[in-house]
Amino acid sequence: MSVSVETRDLSISFGTEPNAVKVLPGVSFSVQPGECFGLVGESGSGKSTVLRCVSMLTDFWKGEVLIAGKSVRDMPLIDRCRILQMVFQDPYGSLHPRQSVRTVLNEPLVIHKLGDREERMRKAITDVGLPVSFLDRFPHQLSGGQRQRVAIARALILEPSLLLLDEPTSALDVSVQAEILNLLQRLREERGFTYIMVTHDLAVVDHMCDRFAVMLRGEITEILPRQAIAGNGATHDYARELIGASLEYEGAH
């Protein structure tokens, strides 16, 4: 089932007053059920921080985050983990090096007291395009792309409605990036997931997202449809510059 997401005046500071640094001064956006919504901008613009706030990995923010109209702060942890999952940037750092794929996938099933564990693990691993035999492999026996597929399988195994994707392909080779993006696209079409995707790459946005927000110094400068990329339909100076630079790069390659 798809869910909507809404942030209202989401703000967060790091450090103590009077030297606290405001990383997000007040971010507001909404995501429709089944939509893929992108967050783009330069490094340090607050994109990943937004995901950490939405997921409650960072919990000392102010404002509101609503999923299907319910505040994430009011959701019990066990319920929140069933609704949303996150896929991280580094497939080499997101899996425990001494745990087999079977252990990685079984752990959330044990925590949530779900039955049919073997069947669920087999389905999760084959859904991401890996054979069942990979359940008995360890991370060092997998390529970067295979590790990221396992990370996606771990996110899928609790059957969430919302996936938070923090640059899920940036650490991978170009050919593998395309495979992972196509996998994510297929899964969204088949299951109706809602995605919020952080990326530096506007080509990824063009391939994956319905709309995207351009962030600068913790603020959203503009929210645009995917179609605005090809003709650089942005109105904010920074957004136009960012899209223009991406188009020039793509044209040169």
Which residue stretches match the model-derived regions?
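Conserved ABC ATPase signature
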Residues: 138-142, 146
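The feature captures the beta-strand-to-loop junction immediately N-terminal to the Walker
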Residues: 40-42
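ABC ATPase NBD coupling module
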Residues: 17-18, 71-85, 99, 111, ...
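Conserved ABC transporter NBD signature motif
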Residues: 63-73
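Conserved ABC ATPase "signature" region
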Residues: 118-133, 244
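Helix-to-loop junction immediately C-terminal to a conserved catalytic motif
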Residues: 55
